[in-house]
Structures are given as structure tokens and as C-alpha cells.
């Protein structure tokens, strides 16, 4: 009897005593089976209204998983009581250590949820001998309870970006409160109708409080922000503009020059093999790499033009006065058009309509590097789980990873 009392004290099954401890041999190994019995003479709590009563309507044995003991799986046989509540009639007893209709104790569920923060669901399921779907359900309920509805009060400055859910051009949008690094909303799609759901959740008053929105040059995002938050400044950040410049100007010019230099073997080899030198920032290059870059630019005047104009374009984001920034832009635009490099001319003409959003950076020094970091973490979350079959659960995991400062 001393063993049962000791186990009961360690187990902490409030309102119940250990009646029997046994072993069962099942496929996969040995199990510890603990039978519990209700403690006599206790008032018990109605799960509906919270009223205390000693009247019991009926009971039904239920097998419930608990944490392992010395790596031996533990199963409890728990008589679940239906109380005869004076207010509600027959209702299930409320227990602090076991949720209604649950097949695992709160203690085991909390342990599973903590491990799911750092391990894939499959590994947690193998560790505790649970089904994959059981672990996923436990973690999902835990996240819903911990996160609750998102608090959108006081949101002023946000960032929006898209990320790939899976291959095949399947995207979702993440919205972040840039002031506190908190994910506010995640939803499937990256069109106007898709992001409109966030603004509907924000409500008319919340939309009026938005001061600035940082984004890439996604036309759908900009159109919806102008429709829902006409007072807000749209801010285009340096990262996406330079990345677009690299794709549409540097890569195309380099490919053209590679094709032209096929007959000149040394120059052709240099142009073809050193693409990454043109794309990296000069201050990130080592001295030998810097020398190699200078040699590359010296061999091709066209590449020199687009490289210099790219670095000059970056300085546009250093200005804090919109008037000076606009003056610099006009000078840069004239040089780009006068360069007679067609990809560069086309890029400058396409970038011109986005100038108001670029100049907004003078007022709001925002960028989406935080969101890009979040997107990288999203890739890690997705890779750990080998993909997600459930969008709602995936989006909860993203919110949990970025609760804010």
C-alpha cells in the first residue's frame, strides 16, 4: 500500500487515489498500468457551471495516457464520473489534470507541446508512442490556447510579404507589426482579395490608424492598402529594388556580354564564372575578390555602367529629406536613360511609377529585412515538419514563433 500512496503523491491526480499498479506486455514492450479510484467524501466540481456536489450519476472507466516512468509508458484507468448537478443535471466532473474527453493528461499534453517547439511531430510521436495525428491535435490545441485571438489594438506600422507554402506557385501572405516584431496575420494567397481578409479583421478604425506599410513591389498589396488605408504611406525597401535590379539588369547584361565574348576565350570565361562578384556588395568582398571584380569591370564597359549605377541607386535610401532624394533620383534616371543599355533603360522606366513609395522611406525608415528573416524561419519550420497538410496549424506555428518583443 505504501507504493500506491507514493505513486499517488508523485502523480498528483487530485481527487483520486491509486487502487492498483500493474504491468501489461504489449507489442513494443512493457507498460505500466495504474488504476485510479475516486477519493471518498469529496465534493466534486460540475464542468458546466462549476457548482460543487457529492452526488454521482454514473461512472465509466477510461484509459488515459500519462508521462512515462523511467521510459516505461504509463496508462491510467480513470473512472470518469458524471455528477448529478442541481443546476445542470448529469454533467462530467471537471478535473484540473485531465480535460473532458481527453485521452492524455494535461501534463503529458504540455510536455508534447513543449517538444513540438523544437522537434518535428513525427519524432515527438515516436518518443511518446503516440499517433502522429494525436500529437498534432495536442500541439494545435496548445497553440490555440496560448496564442488566443490576435490583439490588433495600437497597430500603426506594418510590413507585408509573401512566402511559398509548397512548390507549384502556391503562396501565402504574412503581415508583421514592425514596431514589435510580431506576426499579426498569415493567410493563403497573395492577391488583393486574399490580403483583404486582414484589413477586414483589422476593422475600419484599425485601418485608419495605420501610418505606413512596408512591402515589395507587389501591385496587389499596394492597391489594397490604398483602398483600405488611403492615409497610409507605402514604403518600398532597398532589398527588393536591388534584387529586382540584379535580375532584370545585371543578369541580362551579363548574359548578353557573355554571348558577345564567346570568341574571346579569356574574357568569356571571366564573364561566365564571376556572376556572384557582380551581385555581392563591394564591402563584403575580400581583397583578392575585390581585385578580381575590378579586372572584370575593366574588361567590359557596359558591365561597369550597370554596376556603378546600381551602387548609386542604393544611396537613394540614405536620404532623409524627400526633396533632396527626388533631385538625386532625377539625376540617376537621366544617367540610366543616357546609358544606352536597354535592360537598364527599361528598368528605370518601370521603377519610375514606384518613386512615391521609395521617397516614403525618407519619412519612415522601414525595410522588410525583418520579414525576410521571418520568411527564412518559416522555411525552417516547414522543413522540420517535412511540410504541413493543415494551413491553420502551419499558420499557428508561425504566429507562435514570432509572438513579439
Language model feature labels by segment:
Residues 1-90, 94:
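Short, conserved DNA-binding cores of transcription-related domains
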Residues 43, 48, 54, 167-169, ...:
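Acidic/histidine-rich catalytic cores and adjacent linkers
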Residues 50, 63-169, 207-208, 214, ...:
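Short, positively charged, Gly/Tyr-enriched micro-motifs
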Residues 53, 131, 142-146, 217, ...:
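The DNA-recognition helices of helix-turn-helix-type DNA-binding domains
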Residues 63, 84, 140-159, 163-178, ...:
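Basic, low-complexity intrinsically disordered segments
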Residues 210-216, 245-248, 255:
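Conserved N-terminal glycine/acidic-rich loop preference
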Residues 231-247:
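Inter-helix linker motif
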Residues 247-267:
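Conserved phosphate-handling catalytic cores of large alpha/beta enzymes
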